[in-house]
Amino acid sequence: MNFPLLPVMITDSITDLTPELLQEKGIRLLMLDFDNTIVPYTTSVPTEQMAAWLEWMLSSDVQLCVVSNSRNDRVKIFCKRLGLDCITHAKKPFSKGIRQCLDRYGLKPAECALVGDQIFTDTLGANCAGVRSILVTAIDNHNIWLKLRHVAEKPFIFMARKRRIYFEES
């Protein structure tokens, strides 16, 4: 069993993920963290690159669902505008929102992955739910708390890389 704070996969950006690569790994559903994974905390507008990636992924056989801890309506508005399914109030690292997503899609954890920028919420929640965890670099560290959290996560990223846990090898 892997240590629950180590991501199963690591990549720089969510846009590095392709439908072909995910399907090759047996992933039928990609759960997406919202803040700092798709857009910064300070906006609800995706970059052109992110909007194009989301459109490309939505046209593929890999299903997408935003699973966010946010209670803010901006997540629902964003998802509705782009045609994305979403679950808010997910309570990561607890598995409530992740399990709700699995139930909604009728899939087994092994058929799913969750991509996010935080080890202590996204990675831990995914691993504890049996879903593959994909860690991406945060889009923005706009305040001191985010910077401190990412500093606290560095040893786990180092351990994951030392164990050669990269996306290509998972």
Regions found by a protein language model. Give the residues of each.
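Asp-based, Mg2+/Mn2+-dependent phosphohydrolase catalytic module
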Residues: 2-32, 39, 43-44, 48-114, ...
